[in-house]
Regions:
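Pol beta-like nucleotidyltransferase catalytic core
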Residues: 1-22, 28-36, 40-144
Length: 144
């Protein structure tokens, strides 16, 4: 089918950048975290993520076995309840990171974190995928 080419994921921007700022669908105050393909695409393209999303988005990833990069980025924004304050902290985090790292430093940092990026990729396609499928089946069985 020729329409499949339309759905191809462009990866050029992942190959030419260091991290992704992911604008998730949920941003306000929610009782649970729901991550979309926006976050998953960054992860399976070997990118650290800064998530502009609901509170505890990074916590959600960590609880499911993914590595986040609190040693590189200030991830305290993930704990902030107020959406405006959280966005301000994210902007400061990105600004500080960009101001304090040269291209040469980013190349070195990329090499240093590559094993963690590979872990996230393999985890996404491995045990996490199985978790999602099992969770889906459990929810389907619960529908009456």
């Amino acid at each position: 089918n020729d329409n499949w080419a339309y759905h191809k994921i462009c990866t050029d921007h992942y190959d030419t950048s260091f991290f992704s700022i992911v604008n998730e669908s949920q941003y306000g105050t929610y009782s649970h975290c729901y991550l979309t393909e926006k976050t998953w695409k960054a992860i399976f393209n070997f990118h650290p993520v800064i998530i502009v999303g609901a509170k505890h988005s990074l916590k959600y990833l960590k609880e499911r076995g993914f590595d986040t990069f609190g040693d590189i980025f200030d991830e305290s924004y993930d704990e902030i309840e107020d959406g405006n304050e959280r966005l301000d902290r994210i902007l400061n985090t990105v600004g500080n990171f960009l101001e304090n790292n040269t291209k040469t430093q980013l190349v070195d940092l990329r090499k240093k974190i590559l094993p963690r990026l590979i872990h996230n990729y393999e985890h996404f396609w491995g045990s996490f995928r199985d978790y999602v499928i099992d969770d889906f089946h459990t929810k389907i069985k619960g529908i009456k």
